[in-house]
Amino acid sequence: ETALHPEHYQTTYQYAVGLNASKPWGNETPQSTCCGGTGSENHVKYQEATYFVSDNTLWVALYMPTTLHWEEKNITLQQECLWPAKSSTIKVTAGEARFAMKLRVPYWATDGFDVKLNGISIATHYQPCSYAVIPTRQWKENDIVEITMPFTKHIDYGPDKLPAEIASKDGHQLETAWVGTLMHGPFAMTATDITNWTEATLNIDSRLASITVVEPNGPQTGTTGNLYTLMQGGRTFQPDYYRHDHTTHYFRI
C-alpha cells in the first residue's frame, strides 16, 4: 500500500501484516527513494484505469471524480462522487453516441448494490466480481447513471491458520487459530488500541452482528473527510489508509 504521511512529505510502500504493525515512512525529500517503494506514482495513475473502451462498449472500472472525453464517439461524460464512494453518478455532459455501458460490481458489494439509468433500475440482481450491463442505446446530453454500493462488513481470511508457536511469541500461550482482516467495503480496518496477540482477537458470529458502523459526522472532504468507523464493544476500528501509527489489522478469529 502506498500512503502519504499526514504531517510530513513521506511515503510508504508496504508494511508487515503482523501485530501492532506500523507503516515505515521514507525520507522527507520530494524525490523519496526507490527503496522506500516504487508506487508513489500510483495516486496520479488511477484515472488511467477508470475507463476502458472498445468500438461500441464503455467499461467503468473505478468510481472516482473524473471526466471522460471519448474522442471516437464525440461524447463527454462526467463522474461525481465523494471518497470513499458508496454512491456515484455518471452524467453525459456533451454530445450523443450509441454504445453499451458496463459498470464494475465490486467483490464486496453483496447487499444493496444498484444501477439506475435516468431513475430506473437496470436489473433486480447484480453479481459481485462482474459488470452490470446497460445494453447498447443512444446516449444523449443529461442522461444520468446512478450507482449505489453500500459498504458491507466481512472478513478477509488468511490462507491458513496462525501456528501456536507464532501466536505465543509475545509470552502468552495461544492456540492455533484462523486469522484475517476486518473489512468494511474495500477498506481494511485497523484497531486503535491493540499491543499484544491476546488482544488481537475478534469474537464474532457469521453475520458480524456485534460490529456496528458509525457513519461519518465530520467534514466530507479533506484529511478526515467521510471517515467511516466500526465499533465492537469499546473497541474502535478505522480504515487502514487513515492510520499512520499503530495499525494492527490482522486478527485471530
Task: List each model region and its residues.
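Extended Gly/Ser/Thr-rich low-complexity repeat segments
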Residues: 102, 146-149
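Solvent-exposed beta-strand/loop surfaces of large extracellular or lumenal domains
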Residues: 110-135, 155-163
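Surface-exposed beta-strand/loop patches in extracellular or lumenal glycoproteins
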Residues: 97-107
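Extracellular and analogous surface-interaction loops
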Residues: 90-98
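C-terminal beta-rich recognition modules with glycine/proline-rich loops and embedded aromatic residues
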Residues: 1-91, 127, 148-253
